[in-house]
């Protein structure tokens, strides 16, 4: 098959032969002249079966320059019986006859006489002892005087399903004839090879021969140049878990910030037992330490509970109250760091208990102490946009147990008949169990997460109207820990955490339809600034039995 041909001294320029399928048995000439120049001719090998000698350019007496063979194995091509040559003359490095190899893994008879070889290995699977291109002719493969270039762009990622090794063979003559690469120039650049989409290392292209003019070498290799490391951005998996932790923290705040108060009876007394329930919706953004990372959560929280007085009515010194509740929530998460983004769905179910003691007389009158504990199960279905060399994304669908506890101490000051100031200090701990999982063939060990927070604040309540009592509050919150740690195939993930300070502003109103109503309502808007930013809206319904 000829792209162009001259049987005398005519020039043969700019012809193209394209093979997309079928069978070619007798060789190919991109351009051929008996005595003229042959320039700018191209052979595109995209599919089918090709045998015989394929010359990008061929001239008996003229110059052969700027001719190209493009070998693309994307659609499958068999060149087991083919020889690929840039020209019929030995390469000098000056004639720009080029072989471009892309998406190809297979066998050929031999290659040679190219001034430039361009390797695009993106997406290919590398294995130790399994060359990308195997040459089977018992004649030395001569790549001398050429320039070998390897694609190094952002998408130039090969992959392997086994441990990264010091060398991978790319072009290998499997016979005793060997492969020579004297005076070869290796253009600067390295390719990333990823193991199971989790670990990676940089590799450069290099001949395996010991020296110039030696025939002891037999391959062009990828040679490891740096240490094995976790793929940057893989910590996105822990960022998603921090998003879940923050969502659970918001749920706890929502429940625990609601005072255990029932609607008053008609005579003004406090009932012993009441039912209460609430719903909250929020949109929160949390900056995570390091790598310009953040986590964003949106969703709703629900709970229903039963509050009861625990001490005798005749006790004039103190009030003891307790509550049991069921909690649940559903939401969405988005995460971002310098290298990767992700999103997912989360939900949880749990139970909890709250106990409160309030002093009714003495020097500590109106001082209260609250303790709580909660436990449940949290579920996360997360998908990141971080890909391995084969295009597989890092994702998981797991669930784990969470539990927590905390203390709150505060005091109410009725410094004016119409105004009451409630100041408090809160400590809250939440624990989210870690888990082990396999993602794209890589073992991930994700450690437990512990959140330790304090909140110092005060709330001003207007108490003149019993049917409508607005309030405003401010608080400072500090997260001491909230670190997410883990490892991938024994290599430690970069730490990321919720640690930091946030400010809280709340505006709300408590109201009852009438003084005789068994219903009590509480509506609050909370705004956050700092490490945690966003808005929460809470609505509580309280019913007297």
What are these language model-derived features?
Residues 229-415, 522-531:
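Outer membrane beta-barrel translocator domains of Type V secretion systems
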Residues 292-296, 339-345, 385-395, 438-446, ...:
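Flexible, surface-exposed loop regions and adjacent strand-edge segments
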Residues 185-231:
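Low-complexity acidic/polar repeat-biased segments
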Residues 352-356, 440-545:
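Outer membrane beta-barrel transmembrane domains
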Residues 2-7, 18-20, 25, 29-34, ...:
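Feature marks extracellular polysaccharide-active and adherence modules
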Residues 63, 73-169:
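Extracellular beta-strand/loop-rich repeat segments of large surface/secreted proteins
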Residues 2-12, 29-38, 55-64, 83-93, ...:
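Tandem-repeat/low-complexity and Cys-motif detector
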């Amino acid at each position: 098959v000829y792209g162009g041909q001259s049987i005398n001294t005519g020039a043969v320029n700019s012809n193209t032969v394209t093979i997309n399928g079928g069978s070619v048995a007798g060789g190919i000439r991109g351009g051929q002249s008996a005595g003229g120049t042959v320039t700018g001719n191209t052979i595109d090998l995209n599919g089918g079966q090709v045998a015989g000698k394929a010359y990008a350019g061929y001239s008996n007496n003229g110059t052969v320059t700027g001719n190209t063979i493009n070998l693309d194995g994307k659609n499958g091509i068999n060149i087991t019986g083919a020889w690929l040559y840039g020209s019929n003359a030995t390469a000098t490095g000056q004639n720009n006859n080029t072989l471009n190899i892309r998406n190809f893994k297979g066998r050929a008879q031999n290659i040679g006489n190219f001034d430039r070889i361009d390797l695009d290995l993106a997406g290919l699977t590398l294995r130790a002892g399994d060359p990308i291109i195997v040459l089977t002719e018992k004649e030395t493969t001569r790549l001398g005087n050429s320039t070998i270039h390897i694609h190094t762009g952002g998408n130039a990622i090969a992959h392997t399903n086994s441990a990264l090794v010091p060398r991978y063979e790319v072009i290998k003559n499997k016979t005793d004839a060997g492969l020579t690469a004297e005076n070869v120039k290796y253009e600067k650049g390295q390719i990333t090879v990823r193991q199971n989409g989790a670990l990676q290392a940089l590799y450069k292209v290099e001949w395996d021969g010991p020296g110039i003019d030696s025939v002891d070498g037999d391959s062009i290799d990828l040679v490891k140049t740096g240490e094995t490391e976790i793929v940057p951005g893989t910590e996105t998996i822990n960022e998603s878990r921090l998003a879940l932790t923050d969502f659970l923290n918001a749920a706890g705040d929502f429940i625990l910030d609601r005072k255990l108060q029932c609607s008053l009876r008609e005579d003004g007394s406090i009932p012993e037992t009441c039912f209460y329930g609430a719903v909250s919706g929020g949109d929160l953004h949390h900056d995570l330490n390091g790598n310009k990372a953040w986590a964003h959560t949106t969703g709703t929280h629900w709970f229903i509970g039963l509050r009861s007085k625990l001490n005798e009515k005749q006790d004039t010194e103190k009030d003891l109250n307790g509550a049991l509740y069921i909690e649940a929530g559903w939401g969405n998460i988005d995460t971002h760091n310098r290298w990767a983004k992700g999103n997912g769905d989360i939900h949880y179910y749990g139970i909890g208990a709250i106990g409160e003691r309030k002093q009714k007389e003495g020097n500590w009158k109106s001082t209260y102490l609250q303790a709580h504990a909660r436990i449940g199960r949290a579920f996360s279905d997360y998908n990141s946009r971080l890909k391995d060399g084969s295009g597989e994304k890092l994702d998981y669908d797991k669930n784990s147990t969470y539990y927590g506890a905390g203390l709150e101490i505060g005091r109410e000051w009725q410094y004016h008949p119409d105004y009451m100031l409630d100041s408090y200090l809160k400590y809250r701990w939440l624990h989210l169990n870690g888990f082990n999982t396999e993602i794209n063939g890589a073992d991930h060990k994700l450690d437990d997460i512990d959140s330790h927070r304090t909140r110092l604040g005060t709330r001003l309540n207007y108490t003149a109207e019993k049917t409508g009592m607005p309030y405003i509050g401010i608080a400072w919150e500090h997260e001491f820990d909230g670190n997410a740690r883990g490892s991938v195939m024994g290599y430690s993930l970069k730490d990321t955490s919720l640690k930091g300070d946030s400010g809280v502003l709340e505006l709300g109103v408590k109201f009852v339809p009438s003084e005789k109503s068994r219903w009590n309502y509480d509506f609050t808007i909370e705004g956050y600034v700092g490490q945690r930013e966003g808005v929460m809206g809470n609505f509580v319904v309280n019913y007297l039995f």
